[in-house]
Regions:
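Conserved donor NDP-sugar-binding/catalytic core segment of glycosyltransferases
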Residues: 9, 25, 176-221
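Short, acidic, metal-binding catalytic loop of nucleotide-sugar glycosyltransferases
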Residues: 101-111
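A short, conserved alpha-helix in the catalytic core of glycosyltransferases
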Residues: 1-17, 47, 183-187, 241-266, ...
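A conserved acidic beta->alpha catalytic loop
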Residues: 118-129, 148, 177
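Cell-envelope/extracellular polymer assembly enzymes that use nucleotide-activated donors
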Residues: 81-86, 113, 280
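A recurrent flexible, glycine/aromatic-enriched loop bordering the glycosyltransferase active site
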Residues: 152-155, 162, 218-260, 264
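Conserved donor nucleotide-binding strand/loop of the catalytic core
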Residues: 130-155, 163
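Short aromatic/hydrophobic "clamp" motif used to bind/position activated sugar donors
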Residues: 169
């Protein structure tokens, strides 16, 4: 019923008052979802019917393991395209090697290119690494040389975006490592949707606690990573660590966006050289009429200190 109502509704609002109390009994799902297991299958059937009615192609709808009542939709990738992975780099060759190796070793999405954006490195070993990586991946890895000075994350990515040949841009920190092989598929299935702007992923610290699972506003500080430091297996508040959802913003440590959207909002604001460039970008994307999405089904390590 709710799905059919939202198919017709122009706007859905929340009324912050208790309007109804539900009686809980041993035979009710209000006390235990296992009381009526057939409801879980019925819910997936209802979701599949909903997608069919609204004309959204999906490959499957499945229940998320160990979280009955939460479901994963695998949207059909109807707009496949090249993903341009932009990686700003300044020395720290070991981090870059780990990042790039994980991309090529694990990624199952075939159509991508890697653009390493060189930013005033000093170590000879860094440039030897660039040469080696280009020899290993001559068909789809390039090193771009930014002519600016100092560090400006926004300017680096804007420079890389101009050189990118893909329909999708993926901003990626060099201190990350891919965990899930289908990470690009999981991101593209949302980034392809006209309503979607930015797509972010679940990032983990090396100790398998949450580094990023979406950014919220007004919690402890102006903008903060939600569920930061939660253990990786924790479902989060109302299950928010286990299902894809709209969020206000996502980190640019791993952020996918259609190149057309990136260009529409004029890329990252270069006045935000180090911090808040991603938050500002996501806000402008929302103001342009898009929503931002967090998916926990694409996971990477982010070797950032706590």
């Amino acid at each position: 019923l709710s799905l059919r109502l939202t198919e017709q509704a122009k706007k859905v609002v929340h009324i912050p008052h208790l309007l109804y109390y539900w009686r809980s009994s041993p035979t009710s799902v209000a006390s235990n979802i296992s009381a009526k297991m057939y409801c879980l299958e019925a819910a997936m059937k209802a979701l599949r019917a909903h997608y069919k009615r609204v004309g959204v192609p999906v490959d499957d709808v499945t229940m998320i393991p160990n979280t009955p009542g939460f479901y994963k939709t695998d949207y059909t990738i109807t707009k496949p395209g090249k993903v341009s992975i932009l990686i700003p780099s300044c020395d720290h060759g070991a981090d870059l090697r780990t990042c790039v190796d994980s991309i090529y070793r694990k990624t199952t999405y075939a159509d991508f290119e890697v653009l390493i954006i060189e930013n005033n490195s000093k170590e000879d070993g860094t440039f030897r690494l660039y040469e080696q990586l280009q020899k290993e991946h001559p068909d789809n890895l390039r090193v771009l040389y930014w002519k600016g000075t100092g560090f400006n994350y926004s300017a680096l990515n804007n420079f890389g975006a101009k050189e990118a040949t893909g329909e999708y841009l993926l901003l990626l920190n060099n201190d990350t490592e891919v965990i899930t092989p289908r990470w690009l598929e999981e991101m593209v299935m949302y980034a392809q949707q006209e309503r979607v702007g930015c797509v972010g992923v679940k990032l983990l610290y090396p100790d398998n606690t949450i580094q990023h699972a979406g950014i919220g506003f007004g919690y402890l500080t102006l903008a903060a990573h939600m569920h930061k430091n939660f253990p990786v297996g924790h479902p989060g508040y109302m299950g928010r660590l286990v299902y894809a959802q709209d969020v206000y913003a996502v980190t640019a440590a791993c952020l996918m966006v259609r190149k057309s959207v990136y260009d529409e909002v004029n890329g990252l604001d270069e006045s935000f050289a180090v911090a808040f460039n991603d938050v500002d970008f996501c806000v402008r994307v929302r103001e342009a009429g898009y929503t931002n999405v967090f998916t926990p089904f694409a996971q990477l390590y982010h070797y950032e200190s706590k």
